Amino acid sequence: MRTSQQAVNRVVLIGGGSVGVSYAFALMNQGVTEELAIIDLDADKALGDVMDLNHGKAFAPSLTNVWLGEYGDCKDADIVCICAGANQQSGETRLDLVEKNMKIFKEIVTDVMNSGFNGIFLIATNPVDILTQAVISFSGLPPHRVIGSGTTLDTARLRYELGEYFHLSPKNIHAYIIGEHGDTELPLWSTATIGTVPLLTYLNRSESYTTEDLDDIFTNVRDAAYRIIQKKGATYYGIAMSLVRVTEAILKDEHSILTTSSFLQGEYGVDNVCIGVPTIINRNGVSEIIEVPMNEDEQKQFNHSVQTLKGIYEPTMQMMK
């Protein structure tokens, strides 16, 4: 991995589908990286995307060098972002995808590591928590250098919904979704704040605000992907923007707190699972996992989410051996 003193950052994107190309487009528009290589099985389509992106250089904030990549380009990459894999179909849960995508990932990670890659993996493909942990196993890299998108998008969705409800900017709402990026995720209402005011206190400002509305807000967040998939076939803009946010935090050594899928080694009383939790992200990847206090009900829900992921990951990895 390159050091922070070097001027040129390189991101390699593997998987030029809707999520991957949206990520590439957002990277260029925000000027986050100087180099971007795109690898995809459909080389012609990927080359078309490269051409299309390069034609917009004159309008970008910085001149990102974009090219059709190969696995050898991973050797000098700071980040390899994997967006490849089977898509989630209507009526299919993220966990239903695990067997399809685990096999795809084993081949991809082997090819990346054979290049001499020594950077950070950023995983977007679902089920993201399970595949993030699989990449740790397949790559042999230390866990702090393998990061999943986790519940970064879910947290952004929650802040958006709360912002709409309270007529406030989502940037001033500090509330997290943690757990599986999926059906067992949970909101941390007990520690959520608006500005510096506890969310549950803020509710008392008006009789038009109710705790029952919070349940509806969370349901909207949890089920958002299903609704979007039903209407347009896939989600990609929101997750692409969340991936760019994590990429920026890494490349700029920000030490920002994001709810990535991170490997727990005793935090929250849990071992050996990747799951969405507030995490300090910097140039080295995961710097620290923040242990947010939970009430009894939240802890119970979180433990259920952990067990759900373990119940899928462990038998699936046994099948891969």
Swiss-Prot record:
GO biological process assignments: glycolytic process; lactate metabolic process
Catalytic site positions: H181
Cellular-component GO terms for this entry: cytoplasm
Principal location class: cytoplasm
Disulfide pattern: none
Residues noted as binding beta-D-fructose 1,6-bisphosphate in the record, renumbered to the chain: R159, H174
Regulation of this protein's activity per its record: Allosterically activated by fructose 1,6-bisphosphate (FBP).
Single GO MF descriptor: L-lactate dehydrogenase activity
Binding positions (substrate): Q88, R94, N126, P127, V128, D129, D154, T155, A156, R157, T235
Keywords annotated in UniProt: Allosteric enzyme, Cytoplasm, NAD, Oxidoreductase, Phosphoprotein
Binding site for NAD(+): V19, D40, K45, Y71, G85, A86, A124, T125, N126, S149
Family affiliation: Belongs to the LDH/MDH superfamily. LDH family.
HAMAP family (UniProt xref): Lactate_dehydrog
Protein name as annotated: L-lactate dehydrogenase
Gene designation: ldh
